[in-house]
Amino acid sequence: MTYTLVIVESPAKCGKIEGFLGPGYKCMASYGHIQQLSNLKNIDMENNFKPTFEHIDAKKMQITKLRKAIADSNNVMLATDDDREGEAIAWHICEVFNLSIHHTPRIIFHEITKDAIVRAVNTPTTLNMPIVHAQQSRQILDLIVGYKISPLLWKHISRNSKKGLSAGRCQTPALRL
């Protein structure tokens, strides 16, 4: 039987979504991010800070399950959360599974009700790439700031303390370090 695969972040949503949409739909979860920037080596500083994402080890089994479900489906709809992280997760799903960012439907809903889900399925959009780029920029900055400044804190400030210090893009200005 062919079906449309709806990919969400949380498996808790799947039962209700499948119930609302009926037998022509199957819902699966990514369980959040499936790729990451694990260290500074994943950022090409000489090439406009181009990131190279890696599969998250703990998600390899889920990636395999999603790959099979995508292959068995006749259509895929991305239904990750309506925020920067959700948009980035949807983009990673497209990248990992070779789905078109321009033609894979992106559905957005803010409540798990039949009306909201059906409305989202009937009015799909596409990935919001400016939001994806904003999330990637934040992630890259977090890595650069954290990896470059935290060791300085360890060396110069926390050497007499048993507590480790760290620096981040948001926490450093917020705490006036």
PLM feature segments, named:
Residues M1-V145, P173-R176:
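Intrinsically disordered, low-complexity regulatory segments
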